[in-house]
Every structure is written in C-alpha cells, then in structure tokens.
Amino acid sequence: ESGSGKSTLLNTLAGHLTPDRGAVRFDTRADGLRDTVTMSEPERRMLSRTDWAFVHQHARDGLRMNVSAGGNVGERLMAVGARHYGDIRASATDWLGRVEINEDRIDDRPSAFSGGMQQRLQIARNLVTGPRLVFMDEPTGGLDVSVQARLLDLLRGLVREMGLSAIIVTHDLAVVRLLADRLMVMKDGHVVETGLTDQVLDDPQHGYTQLLVSSVLQV
C-alpha cells in the first residue's frame, strides 16, 4: 500500500537516506563486506557508480534530459574512468541496442523519447558499468500496460543474462510474480510477511497479505 515505507526502505538501503540506527552491509568488489552507512560520501558515491545502480520510477529523475541518449550512457562510463571516445560511443551504441533503442537515436535527447523509451534508456545508463545490485523503485509505474509488459520482459532478460541481484519496490503483484524470487510485504512501516514469492502469493499467511492477494490476483 502507499505510505507503507517501501520507498523509504529502498532509499535507505541505497544510501540516499541515513538510518537512525543499524547497519547496511554489502559485499563490495573492492573491499569485501562493508557497512555502507559508515562509508564516507566519496566511497558511497563510487559504490553507486560501480557495484550499484538505481532505476527511478520516473525516468526523468535518473536521466539528464538535456544530454543525448549516447551521452547519458557515456557519462556513466566516464564516471568510472573511461576516457576513449570511440570506446565509450561503441559501448553506448551496444547498450542502446540491448534495451531496444535504435542506434540512429544515439544523438537524440531523452525529451524526444516516449515514456517507455526513456525508462529503457535509464536502464541502459545504469547497467552499462556492470553493477552487481540494482535498486528499482516502481520501474513500470505510470506506463501503459503494453509498455509495461515489454519493459518487464527486458528487465527479466537483463537480470538473468548479467546475473544481477535486484531489490524492487512495487505495489503491482504481477511485477512481483514475474521478477522476484523472494517477496517482503510491508504495512505501516513494518514487514508483515516474507518468503519465496510463489509461496507467499499462493499461500499467504498474514491477514493483510491475504487481503492484498485476493484483491489483485486470482491465485
């Protein structure tokens, strides 16, 4: 439900918000297991460019709208040290193709794209550096049903192909069923049920989860 704390939890895990107490531990490529809460701001910023990615609900929040599609992808590579223009443009072209955007749109700005294309461009921008963990906040929110289906197929394929871990916030149980191996149900800032996705959706135990499933899915 709205206001249950899903996005707050996601933003805390991703380092956008600081928790009042506790730790967020992540097995980094560079230094092994670290508490990201105690990292310095430069360390956390580099982590968000290398090991992590964040896909916003509204693509405009994750893109630079006054920069070309290729530039949006290329900037992410430059942030982790890439400098050769030809290599950067080649990687950008490759990733546009992987998210089903024609390479002849590489010099177009995102403002000329549809909502679905903007979201696919945001995904390319985030995944080009090969992150290990992707945070997604309502990645299909506000899109037409047909556009949602195409985006979900794309996301599922990329997550599997790249061996990514993903933490997804959504109120859409169809998205949960398609993308999530495990499910956590929240209400009023508390976790009320957790488990394997199929198990929770097919045999919900908590009263709120039962109500949620019965109102949305036929299981």
Question: How would you describe each model-predicted region?
Answer:
Residues 14:
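Helix-to-loop junction immediately C-terminal to a conserved catalytic motif
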Residues 194-195:
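ABC ATPase "signature
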Residues 176-178:
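A short, surface-exposed alpha-helical micro-motif characterized by mixed small hydrophobic
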Residues 23-46, 200:
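ABC ATPase NBD Q-loop/coupling interface
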Residues 87-104, 213-214:
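Conserved ABC ATPase "signature" region
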Residues 109-113, 117:
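Conserved ABC ATPase signature
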